[in-house]
Amino acid sequence: MKPSADHPWPVDLGEARVIQERIRAQVITCDAFGPIRTVAGVDAGYSGDSALAAVVVLAFPSLQALDYAVARRQISFPYVPGYLSFREAPAVLDALASLRITPDLLMCDGHGLAHPRRCGIACHLGVLTDLPSIGCAKSVLVGAHDPLPDVRGAWTPLRHDDEIVGAALRTRPGVRPVYVSVGHRVSLETAIQFVMACVTRYRLPETTRAADALASQGRIPR
C-alpha cells in the first residue's frame, strides 16, 4: 500500500492543531467496512532523535502473522503531549507503504477519539489511509470511567467533557484495563469486539504485542 499525508511534514504547533481539527471532521464513527480478514498492529517508539515504527499484519481471526515492516524516520516535531502523531505517524506511514499486504483494519497502540481534540494517532492514520482503525492504549490520556467489574470482556464508557470518547475494557481478570477508542470507520462497540477477538492469554491484544516485539526486539512473538 502507498498511504500518504495530505499535509506536509513537519508542521509547527499552530498548523498541527488546524490539521487535527480537519482530520477530526473527517472521522467516521460508524461501521463502514467490508469483511475483515487481516488486522495490522501498529506501534511506534523512539531511538535517539528518530522515530521507529513497526507494523505487523495478522490473519483474522486466526492471528497468524502474514506480513510485517519497520521504518525509521528523523523526528522534526517537538515532544508535546496530544501531538505525538506528528512525531510518530510519518514513520508509521513509511512502514505501511512497505507492506506487501494491505490490512483490512489498523489497531494502533495509542488513542483515537480519546484525545483532547478527538484526534489521536488512530484517527490520524485511519483518515490518512482511509482504513478502518482502532485505538487501544495502555493508559488514559483524557477522561474518567466508573469502576470496572473484574470479568473478562467487561467494559464501561470513558467520558471526557460529558462525551463518551472510548471505553475502559477488561481483557483479563486481575489485570488493569486497556482503553479502546474509535479511530475511523468503526463504531466503539465494534472496536471493543475486535480488541477482544485479538486477545489471547495476555492483557494486550496480539496486534499490540506483535508490533511492540518487532519494534523492540526485532522479532514477532509466536
UniProtKB/Swiss-Prot annotation:
Its EC number is 3.1.21.7. Gene3D superfamilies: archaeoglobus fulgidus dsm 4304 superfamily. One of its GO terms (molecular function) is deoxyribonuclease V activity. One of its GO terms (cellular component) is cytoplasm. Keywords: Cytoplasm, DNA damage, DNA repair, Endonuclease, Hydrolase, Magnesium, Metal-binding, Nuclease. Mg(2+) binds at residues 43, 109. It catalyses: Endonucleolytic cleavage at apurinic or apyrimidinic sites to products with a 5'-phosphate. The keyword Metal-binding applies. Its cofactor is Mg(2+). GO terms for biological process: DNA repair. It comes from the Bacteria. It is found in: Cytoplasm. The record marks 79 as: Interaction with target DNA. Pfam families: Endonuclease_5. Disulfide bonds: none annotated. It is an enzyme of class 3 (hydrolase). Belongs to the endonuclease V family. NCBIfam families: PRK11617.1. DNA repair enzyme involved in the repair of deaminated bases. Selectively cleaves double-stranded DNA at the second phosphodiester bond 3' to a deoxyinosine leaving behind the intact lesion on the nicked DNA. This is Endonuclease V. It comes from Roseiflexus castenholzii (strain DSM 13941 / HLO8).
